[in-house]
């Protein structure tokens, strides 16, 4: 068996991000790095995330640099992974007309994943915070095996 690894192209990275809905967000917290799974939607140069008020949000406001990883694993040597590095922004509809427009766009984008988000029937009503991550750097890898 021959195992090969290669970098994914920018288009392949975007395709994997578009095909996934759960990623792992890594961020600095009390002299360590924490990582948490969460739902996201990719849209252009941005990832839109939804969370609740708490420790993660408090830390992200003070240390906005994050990484988000998504992957598609079919076997030990049959997988693809994308890592996005960027800065996170808290979206607040009270930040004037531009803030309201960013919030409305984020909610509409997130509703592609969860149609009832921020509406009657919302499956996670306690998650009232919308964030977006600017995809400053995106890279991906793929492993594959062949019987050569």
What are these regions (language model features)?
Residues 20-52, 68:
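Short beta-strand segments
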